[in-house]
Amino acid sequence: MVSKMNNIQSSGEISQHKAAKIAGIIFPISIIILMVVNLTVVAPLIIKSNPSETARNISSHEFLFRIGIAGNILYSVCEVVFLIALYTILKNVNHSFAIFAAICFMINSFSWLLIAINQFTVIRLLNDIGFSHSFRPEGLFAMVRLHLIGEDIYYIGLLFWALGCTVISCLLLKSRYIPKSLSVFGIISSAWCAGCTFIFYIFPNYANVINLWWFDSPMVLFELAMSIWFLIKGIKTQQPEPA
């Protein structure tokens, strides 16, 4: 009986170590995908002050725009893999909180699917002759611009991402799977992101006080550092405290 219990525990530890390696690989990849497709592929096509020029850019570079859509979908898939890996690592620390964090990450992942769906709608609006006959050019361009406003969806997802990351950081602090200082930085940066995002919902001009890049950049740096630690150092499964 004791031998069987030891085998089960050993199997669980192996799963956690594998999950840590997966998390260490998948998050940096997902961030690279997200940054490349949105900052270097999609962003140059969108001119916020000129919807008609934006529509022409997308029509002329539809292949690039579709690469951006595919990248957002791939990022969403990577996020699901990442949250499963984190849940596997932390479920023995506190199952309920690990589930909550996974749900938060799932909502963030879903937000990127919504952005991708809106981008597909843009292509449909521009390519379907029926739409060009139903709307005046100004109206069609306005519809295109409306579906390209992914910031609102992003910042809704960001709040849940930050909440999930805050919980993850607390569980990592409790488990001591990573250095205490790194866990504390994760708690502070994630709570900061959640707070800034929520204030931004109510006071849009808050972005004039705190640059939007400062909302999530510290949290992303934490997750990158955590991922590198998982990949290089792994986790010490003998140390976590019972929930």
Language model segments and positions:
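Hydrophobic, aromatic-enriched alpha-helical segments typical of multi-pass transmembrane helices
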Residues: 2-243
